[in-house]
Structures are given as C-alpha cells and as structure tokens.
Amino acid sequence: MLRITPLASAIVALLLGIEAYAAEETFDTHFMIGGMKDQQVANIRLDDNQPLPGQYDIDIYVNKQWRGKYEIIVKDNPQETCLSREVIKRLGINSDNFASGKQCLTFEQLVQGGSYTWDIGVFRLDFSVPQAWVEELESGYVPPENWERGINAFYTSYYVSQYYSDYKASGNSKSTYVRFNSGLNLLGWQLHSDASFSKTNNNPGVWKSNTLYLERGFAQLLGTLRVGDMYTSSDIFDSVRFSGVRLFRDMQMLPNSKQNFTPRVQGIAQSNALVTIEQNGFVVYQKEVPPGPFAITDLQLAGGGADLDVSVKEADGSVTTYLVPYAAVPNMLQPGVSKYDFAAGRSHIEGASKQSDFVQAGYQYGFNNLLTLYGGSMVANNYYAFTLGTGWNTRFGAISVDATKSHSKQDNGDVFDGQSYQIAYNKFVSQTSTRFGLAAWRYSSRDYRTFNDHVWANNKDNYRRDENDVYDIADYYQNDFGRKNSFSANMSQSLPEGWGSVSLSTLWRDYWGRSGSSKDYQLSYSNNWRRISYILAASQAYDENHHEEKRFNIFISIPFDWGDDVTTPRRQIYMSNSTTFDDQGFASNNTGLSGTVGSRDQFNYGVNLSYQNQGNETTAGANLTWNAPVATVNGSYSQSSTYRQAGASVSGGIVAWSGGVNLANRLSETFAVMNAPGIKDAYVNGQKYRTTNRNGVVVYDGMTPYRENHLMLDVSQSDSEAELRGNRKIAAPYRGAVVLVNFDTDQRKPWFIKALRADGQPLMFGYEVNDIHGHNIGVVGQGSQLFIRTNEVPPSVNVAIDKQQGLSCTITFGKEIDESRNYICQ
C-alpha cells in the first residue's frame, strides 16, 4: 500500500470539506506522491486521467495485459500526446491509420473506437482496443521484445550447514555441507557455477564442481546457448554430465500451455531431520526440516532425467531412504511447436578416468492435436544410439511409444548390440478427477547399452575407488547397469467435496543377470475436517533379496489463532501429531507445536516431543529459524537419554553491482535489485522480513523468467522522510538475469508550515508555492497550511493569492523553519 504523506492527508481532508473549489481547481494526484519536481505549474488539476505535462516511465496495458514499460512525453495538451510506429508495434496493436504516412498516433487514433485511461498514481496507462486490432497473448505471457537482459553483476547464493550428533553407545559424528550457486552477468552473458563442499567426521573434506558454464538466451531462436561443464537433456536419452557446448530450446520462453513439469519431493519427518537429495551422485539439496510433512518444490537441478535419491536422517541417527522417479512426461507438444536440443563435447562422468567424445541431437515436433514425432541420435567413439518415437493425444490420454537401438564396442573388443522400448501414459479424467501423473514402462534387451553404460564398462577393470568419490562404480552397477524392466506410475484421485484426496505411486525394477526385483509402493490419503487437516500414508518396499519393509503413518495438524490484525497482530500456532507403525506394530510418535512470531513475522519456531518404541526412548527437541533481511539462520537441538543432536545453518546471497554490494535473505537463479533511494525499511510483496536497507536497496528473488513479475514496495512501516512516487513496478527478465528496478523517490526534506496573509485571512487552498527561482516546491493545503519539499531551507517562498491579477505574497524564513510557528505571508 502507498504511504500516506502529509500532503496527501491535507488534500484528502480538504476534498471532504470544500466542494466549491473542487469544481474550479483540480489537483493532479501524481503530486500527492511526489509530483513533478522543479517544474512550474500554472493550473493544478485533481484528475488522474489528465497527467501534468512532462516525461514519464509508464507501464502500458492493452486489454488488461501488460505490454511493457515505455517512456512517454505528455504534451501541454494531453490530447496531442502520441506513440511512435515502433512502440505501437511492440504493443501488439495493428492500426490502419499508419497508411496515411503518420509516424505517430494520438491515443484517440490508436484505440480505434476504444478507450484509454491513466492511473498516474501508479504510472499506468490502459488501452482498451477492439480485439480485432490486437495480437492476442496468453495470460501472463510477455513477448520477447520486452524481455530484459538485466545489469552487470556478480552474485553468489550460499548455504552452510553443520550437523552434530553424540551417541553414548557409538561416539559422535559431525557432517558439514556447503553449497555455492554463483554467477557473473556481463554484457548479457551469464557465467554460472554450482559447487559444493562435504565433510564427514575426521575424513578430509572434498570440493566438487557440479556445473560451470557460460550462458546466453536468444529470443530469435527461443533457445539458450551454454558452453562449459553441464548436463545433456534427458528428454530422449539418459542425462550425461559433460564438457562442451549445448544449444537447446528453452520451453519457458513459450507460453505456459506449452511447457513441461518439475519434480516434487515430499515425505514426513519424525524429528528434527536432515533431508538430503542426490542426483547423479551429487548432493543437490540438503536442509534441516522440523517434524511433520515436508514438500520440496524449489529444486535447482542441473541434469534432467536422473532419478532423485532422497534420505531422511532423523535426530536419533536412523535413516530412511527412497527414490523419486524423475522422467519426462510423454513427449507431447502443441501443434506447430518444436523442441530442439544439440550437444557436443566430452563426457565428464564422476569417478570415471576414461571419458569419451560424443555428439547428441534431438528434435520433437507437434504435427497436430493428435500426433507428435520425436527422435534423436548419439554418436561417440565406438558407440552410437538412435531413437524414434511418437506421441499420441487420444481420448484415452496422452501416450508415447519409442524405440532405441544401441551399439557399443568396448576397449577389450566386446561388442554389444541391443534395443530398448518404452511406453508412457498421462491422463486426467475430469469426470472422476483422476490424474495419472506419469505411468511409464521400459524394456531393454540384455545387450542394450546407454552411453553411461558404455563409459562405465570401459572403466570397470581399472577403477580404483577414491575415498572422496561421492559415487562408487559399484553403486552404478548395483542400481543402473543392466536394467531389464522398469515401471513407474503416479496417480491421484480427488474425492467428492469434503472427502479429501488419494494418491498412489509405485516403482518396480528388475535386472539382467540378477534374480529378484526391487519394488516400492506409496499410498496416501489427505483431508480436512473444519480447520483440522490430516494425512494417512502407507508405504511398502521390497529389495532384490526379498527383504520387506512396511510403514504406516497418521499425521494430524490443528491450528489455533488470535489477534484481529488491527489492534493486535494476528498470530497462529499449529499443534501436530505424527504416529508411525512398522512391521512390528507401533514404532514412534511425535507431538509438536510450531508458529511464527516477530514484528515482521521473521521468526519461525517449533518444539516437539517424540517417543521411539524401539529402545523405549523419549526425545525432546526444538528448532528456530530467523528470516533476517540479509540472511536466513536456522538452529535445532534434540536430546534423549542416549544421544544429543544439534544442527545449524545459514543461507543467503551476496550481490555486487554498480550501485554497491548488497546482502540478501536468499537468491534464486533470476532476481531483482530494487532501488528506492532514501526509502529505508520498506518491505517487498508482503514479505515483512525482506526490507530495503538504509540506501533504499533490497534484493528480491523468486523472479519468473520471461513472465510478468509484479514488484511492490510497502512503506507503511518506514520512517524515512523521502517520498515514494509510485510503489509498483513490473519486470520480465531473461533466465538468469539480474534486473535493476528503480523506484522514483523525492528525497527533499518535507516541511509542514502554518501561514496566513497579512490581513489575517487564510491562503487560498490548492495554490502553488514557488521558490525564489519560480520553481514549484509545494502547495497550500487545508487550514492555510503549506506543504513544501526542499533540499535546503529556502530564504523565502512565494504563494499565489490572486492568479487572475498575478498577485502573490512572500514568506521569509531565517536559517531554519519552525513548524510550530505561524508565519505571515506579505
């Protein structure tokens, strides 16, 4: 919301009481939030629809869709203000009026029978144009010409955690994890780095560089170029870590209806637990979570198709592991939409000493509403693979079928030729609200080899495990090599209103040359009763040795709140309980309380009490998170009769740009530097703990590339004397861009002055106040009170008293202005 300034208060009060003057004199509300500094004003208007003459940076909307920010010069007669041919084209408006040779159209000519409205208070201009003259855009989509490259900047997003456990029976253990996602943006190019450090107990720590590449998006290609260390796509072939070059279509550049999905990791923690997610042998995510359900949706994954290995380490040292399938949905594209991907370089597979050069290419094309064709090839030293597939959008759901042929010649002369076939299915049944998120089955012949298989096989005989290797070759041959059948499925069902929803997931695999198979099933039911929410979850897992593990969990959460958010802050606390059963019956129970406190809701806390049936052990724990403007700090502690556990982490970001160095609560891949000079402690988009610093700068993450991002500053809690001229901005950045969003402010010192004419009569409401140079610096408000803004105390000011005769009076000040004094205008 906008901050109510003294001037705004005076004008609003006057409008309620002086109707006669309002009919003659109008006041531009732009002036209420700062006005047009240092410009002389002859007639002040109280009319949002007719801005004062001058230059404005305006957000333009066409039929309620944002079409970008433009610089507009409003003429003395606003009706003569016009837009150029280039701007109109970027707005997506087709106009026959250009046929007459005009290079600039007035707003009346532009709307062609429609209308336009100003909202100068938020620097917005709306055109309502007949739809036949407008190029239609999908809601939220921004055309490429309005994407922003951003500024030159260096940044790093960091996460540092320390996890300590002390067990009476086995001693203590300590793990340290550090991750940096860094970038250097220069002249529209972006250098990205993802590196981590891991250390356990007394073992020497090891640094790992997961990715390091140079990137640039190209709007003409609707694609992105990368050069360096990265991963190939997993749309057609398995993802491969490599060093080289990759050019691919960035589907996020397209409207939302033409894009893909990202994975979601969820589970239930029984205590203050450490959740670790690995992909391709790299730790891609690690975070402490409090007891209860958790859902991780903000994964930043460098490689696409590798499954996610999830481990949940409880405070007592027990570890639960499970696998989240990460495969693309059936390769269906909208009619006329194509998707390309080209990569060339040398494999850089972790732990392998012998690497291989390769070239990979893939292409998909949507022919019509029914058919999508796709294919790809991968060629390397003594290896090749070709894939052809088709996707069908049928009334029974989306189905894709593909076949891959591979040829692998090993260094020892062994030759393997094989085939792999896959069928995948995706369907939402609207009549029953049933969603088959992904059901996929793949069969591979005994001699089928992926490129990863080919490289690993050439490293098998001379492999020597390094104790710092995250991924052992034995792990690969245990989990990935020689797969025969693989089946995965996810299904969710919404029940009739009030009955909740059910979800089911399954994963089944078997291998050539090995007996047995691995199976994993998960079933959950969730619902709400009044304000109480609950989840029933069951899981069953089998490994190849026919070992079975069963779990059943009941989770319930009850909210309690108080405060009306007017006289007292609104507060809410949650009481939760989680009970788990296993093959032996009752296994554990956890009861907890959690909530948010602080004047800016910056503290999240939780306390819990748990009981483990095995060992008859009771544990008490607590956790606290501080969302500070410059970092996020977390701490946890648990203790029982047999162990103690403590954990701490700090995360945030550092941004260096031409305006200085700023700290951030957190950073994402794409973010904004918001600059409102002189405005301190204003918060962004309702996040009260994310505030501007003393220079008026705040870093805001979570920007969505190629989309409208609405940014709003709330100065209601700011004590700054500077005034904000418009508190809302819109930005549409390229992926990975650092966007500078400038807010216009007036940092001149405000003064509220009481004054009368020499005859004791009040000064005329609404008349301007000018300095000795004739520049407008304020206005006369209600009750003959003046509001002015100046950098220094003026020696005197002039106030108009009779415009028709050109009469004015002067108020003289000394070295300072006394706001408690009554001045005389002579």
Describe the residue ranges of each PLM region.
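Flexible, glycine-rich linker and terminal segments associated
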Residues: 24-59, 67, 81, 86, ...
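Beta-propeller domains
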Residues: 372-385, 400
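Short, contiguous acidic and Ser/Thr-rich linear segments
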Residues: 68-80
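Extracytoplasmic assembly/pore-lining segments of large envelope/extracellular complexes
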Residues: 296-304
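Outer-membrane beta-barrel transmembrane domain signature of Gram-negative proteins
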Residues: 342-360, 364
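Gram-negative bacterial Sec-dependent N-terminal signal peptides
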Residues: 1-22
